[in-house]
């Protein structure tokens, strides 16, 4: 485990409850996590501790932050290993660092496939990164966070936890587990720790790099663009939701459709969503619908 530290600075801005707080963000090297790091620092004067595995990307983030890099430090480790979280907690405690907010954002999206085509190794890896990393982080961090007067935990789940579609069995299961656990922990620590749950829909980040998009048709591309949310907007929505201390945050056109559809129409929403994907012939779902 490696830690690169920078001097903490200050900035002037309108106060909100997490201004100038110390925030831990996992999955900080790209996508939503990277966006959160930059916004929390630039707009709220937060001191951010980023966690990721890719040192090259973390160094690039430091460069992007420019003179704001003094607000940033990072640790390099695999969030799916519980011992890494123990070492992390021990290290920041020994350094006298008091974190206020933990944002569990790290996650992976397995290639869309039929359940029977996943190996047990694929399944275990998805559950470890998407679910157990949250378990391990909160297990060691909650006692530390309770020492803060502005304690908060934000777990990033997915719209897949709201409505499962064909090809996402493992991903949906891992994110649904995060959702259920978060909702329970919220009640257990109500009044002591703000606990927020984020269920983002399709977001234009590199989490889809495992998916084989192939040569999508114009209709398919337009459909993806129509339901996808830019990373910048998603980050803005999440930070705004945290500012308002929202309990459940469902962001993105597709996520809201899946959430509302499940509430009013139950499992029919999963059936309709899967049927639409099948009919538009998205290449990234070819192993789900167009192979044995």
What are these regions (language model features)?
Residues 158:
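Residue(s) in the substrate-gating loop at a strand-loop-helix junction
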Residues 113-115, 119-124:
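Substrate-binding pocket helix/loop in short-chain dehydrogenase/reductase
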Residues 55-56, 76-87, 120:
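The beta1-alpha1 cofactor-binding region of Rossmann-like NAD(H)/NADP(H)-dependent oxidoreductases
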Residues 190-253:
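SDR active-site lid
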Residues 138, 174:
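Active-site helix of classical SDR
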Residues 45-60:
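Conserved glycine-rich Rossmann-like NAD(P)H-binding loop of the short-chain dehydrogenase/reductase
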């Amino acid at each position: 485990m490696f830690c690169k530290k920078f001097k903490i600075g200050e900035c002037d801005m309108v106060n909100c409850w997490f201004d100038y707080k110390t925030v831990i963000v996992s999955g900080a090297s790209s996508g939503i996590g990277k966006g959160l790091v930059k916004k929390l620092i630039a707009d709220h004067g937060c001191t951010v501790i980023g966690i990721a595995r890719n040192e090259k990307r973390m160094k690039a983030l430091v460069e992007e932050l420019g003179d704001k890099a003094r607000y940033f430090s990072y640790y390099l480790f695999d969030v799916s290993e519980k011992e890494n979280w123990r070492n992390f907690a021990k290290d920041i405690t020994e350094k006298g660092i008091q974190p206020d907010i933990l944002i569990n954002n790290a996650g992976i999206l397995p290639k869309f496939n039929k359940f029977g085509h996943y190996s047990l190794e694929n399944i275990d890896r998805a559950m470890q990164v998407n679910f157990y990393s949250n378990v391990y982080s909160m297990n060691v961090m909650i006692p530390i966070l309770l020492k803060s007067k502005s304690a908060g935990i934000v777990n990033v789940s997915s719209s897949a936890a709201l409505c499962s579609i064909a090809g996402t069995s493992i991903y949906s299961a891992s994110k649904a587990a995060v959702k259920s656990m978060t909702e329970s922990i919220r009640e257990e620590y109500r009044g002591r720790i703000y606990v927020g749950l984020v269920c983002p829909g399709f977001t234009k980040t590199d989490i889809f790099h495992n998916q084989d998009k192939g040569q999508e048709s114009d209709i398919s591309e337009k459909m993806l663009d129509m339901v996808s949310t830019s990373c910048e907007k998603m980050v803005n929505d999440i930070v705004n939701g945290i500012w308002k201390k929202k309990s459940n945050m469902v962001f993105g056109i597709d996520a809201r459709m899946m959430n509302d559809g499940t509430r009013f129409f139950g499992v029919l929403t999963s059936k309709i969503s899967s049927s639409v994907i099948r009919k538009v012939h998205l290449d990234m779902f070819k192993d789900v619908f167009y192979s044995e």
